[in-house]
């Protein structure tokens, strides 16, 4: 019998790629539960659509490339992309929005560059930006939390809104949104940005019913849910601490400085940290091992730059939330960051 020796390392952690991906997906569950509680079961419908779509597109591309289908599907990377995209779009977005996003994420961003490990950008965020730029109306159709709705939308009506654009009584998403005390803005970040532009102070804006004491009603708990999941990933050593800590620290520092400089028009540190996609961005998106920086020093720089861009775009840009744009922009800089932060090889110090 011929024996062969595999290449090193021979001692490993027994953490397969599939197990890592499924662990990250499981860590999304607290944030997912918070979204379902505060924004309805539409997010579950989007999640099912996304998982089916990414599986179909991944399998189709593997067949076209004459590669084995099951190994590509079973590694879980496509499923994680679908989960992150489904959690990022409005729960009642039309069904074709998530399908187009999954098509772009898997076929263009991931497989066109060679598949897992070769994509330059985070597939879920690249797809999110494509959808936001191409379909801004559908991608900003966030409903207020269910407690503020005059008539809570049941599962069947949410299903009808996603697939037909209307409830059983003939109401569209826009009509449902406009029925909540005249509120038509999508998220707390939207509301503060618009109100400040119209001359209101932050404290006046936050008197509206969509806000809680610290941040947007519902969004605070969604972010805390993703924070809990992110802390679990850190404890399980699935991700390193450098990127989320530098991301959150940079955003906290910038927002604190902004609040000190202009307390009337800047919402402050806690609001920035617990609104929008801050926590899912810090722990689940920016930490993508393929498109993020690879050295510890580089990860600190990478995360800090993303946090800085999130603050700048939220404050001075045209989009209220900026995590996706910030991650993609710093993805471009990753080769440069890695080049200048490579650790010095022992025995090859600089010549004096």
Where do the model's predicted regions map?
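N-terminal signal-anchor module of multipass membrane proteins
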Residues: 1-63, 347-350
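Cytosolic-side transmembrane-helix boundaries in multi-pass membrane proteins
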Residues: 1-20, 313-352
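Structural signature of hydrophobic alpha-helical transmembrane segments
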Residues: 41-53, 92-101, 209-223, 266-278
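Cytoplasmic-side transmembrane-helix entry/capping segments in multi-pass membrane proteins
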Residues: 69-80, 98-101, 118-129, 241-249, ...
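C-terminal ends of transmembrane helices
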Residues: 8, 56-68, 106-117, 227-238, ...
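Loop-to-transmembrane alpha-helix initiation sites
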Residues: 120-125, 269-278, 299, 317-330
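Long hydrophobic alpha-helical segments that form multi-pass transmembrane helix bundles
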Residues: 123-224
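A generic, well-ordered mixed alpha/beta core segment in the N-terminal half of proteins
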Residues: 81-154
């Amino acid at each position: 019998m011929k024996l062969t020796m595999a290449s090193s390392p021979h001692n490993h952690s027994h953490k397969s790629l599939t197990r890592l991906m499924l662990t990250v997906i499981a860590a999304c569950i607290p944030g997912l539960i918070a979204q379902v509680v505060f924004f309805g079961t539409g997010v579950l419908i989007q999640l099912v659509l996304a998982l089916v779509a990414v599986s179909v597109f991944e399998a189709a591309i593997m067949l076209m490339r004459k590669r084995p289908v099951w190994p590509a599907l079973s590694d879980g990377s496509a499923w994680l992309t679908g989960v992150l995209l489904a959690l990022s779009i409005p729960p009642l977005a039309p069904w074709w929005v998530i399908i187009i996003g999954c098509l772009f994420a898997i076929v263009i961003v991931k497989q066109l560059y060679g598949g897992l490990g070769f994509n330059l950008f985070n597939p879920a965020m690249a797809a999110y930006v494509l959808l936001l730029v191409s379909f801004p109306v559908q991608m900003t159709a966030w409903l207020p939390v269910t407690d503020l709705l005059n008539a809570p939308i049941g599962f069947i009506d949410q299903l009808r809104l996603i697939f037909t654009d209307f409830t059983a009584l003939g109401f569209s998403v826009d009509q449902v949104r406009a029925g909540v005390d005249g509120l038509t803005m999508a998220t707390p970040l939207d509301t503060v940005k618009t109100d400040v532009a119209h001359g209101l102070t932050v404290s006046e804006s936050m008197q509206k019913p969509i806000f809680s004491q610290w941040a947007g009603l519902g969004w605070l708990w969604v972010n805390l849910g993703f924070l809990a999941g992110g802390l679990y990933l850190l404890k399980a050593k699935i991700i390193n601490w450098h990127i989320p800590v530098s991301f959150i620290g940079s955003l906290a520092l910038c927002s604190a400085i902004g609040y000190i400089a202009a307390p009337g028009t800047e919402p402050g540190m806690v609001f920035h940290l617990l609104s929008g996609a801050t926590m899912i961005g810090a722990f689940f998106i920016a930490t993508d091992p393929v498109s993020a920086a690879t050295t510890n020093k580089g990860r600190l720089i990478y995360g800090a730059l993303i946090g800085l861009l999130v603050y700048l775009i939220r404050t001075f840009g045209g989009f209220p939330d900026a995590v996706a744009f910030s991650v993609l922009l710093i993805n471009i800089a990753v080769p440069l960051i890695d080049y200048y932060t490579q650790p010095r090889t022992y025995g090859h110090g600089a010549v004096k």
